[in-house]
Amino acid sequence: MTTATTAARARTRGRLFDWKLGVGIAAVAGLLCLSLLTGVYDIFGGDGGSEMFAITRIPRTLALVLAGAAMAMCGLVMQLLTQNRFVEPTTTGTTEWAGLGLLLTMVAIPGASIVTRMVGAVAAAFIGTMIFFLFLRRVTLRSSLIVPIVGIMLGAVVSALTTFIALKTDMLQNLGVWFAGSFTSVMRGQYELLWIVALVALAVFIV
């Protein structure tokens, strides 16, 4: 049995590391280079180009990579917990709960720092995900499609509540900017907490 298990793991690892993975890595590397070279400021001919490159371009690119890795890790963990391939943060209401947490943090603490906003968004996303799992325990799952449908419905309710609160507090425009997901304003000193994602990814890979 040990030999069979080892052989199965070797075949699985062989399927993971094939030419498709190489193409994907090359494409991602190309996009990273494109992100580093994209911007209004001329980093090659302008004064202080290297400083601007270190302050804005590198942090922006790293923030993009780490945010994407965070979404991927969330999707992986959710799929492992629910044993459903259709489950991800956008189909479970997690992103909507994060938006609600961010909005409530800004309303309660107008001058909140970026760290405080992140903590509020993460806490709300965690609570919302737990509520989603509680819903699943009370729903008869006749099909694998029921799980994302429940999540999308829950997310729609949370999104409507968030929009209502934003409208009442005159923060609807800010809410639209947040949900646009723009990384253009990311600078050094604003993204370092995202390195926690790399540690979590390493822990999941080891386990």
Question: Predicted segment positions?
Answer:
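Alpha-helical transmembrane segments in inner-membrane proteins
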Residues: 2-207
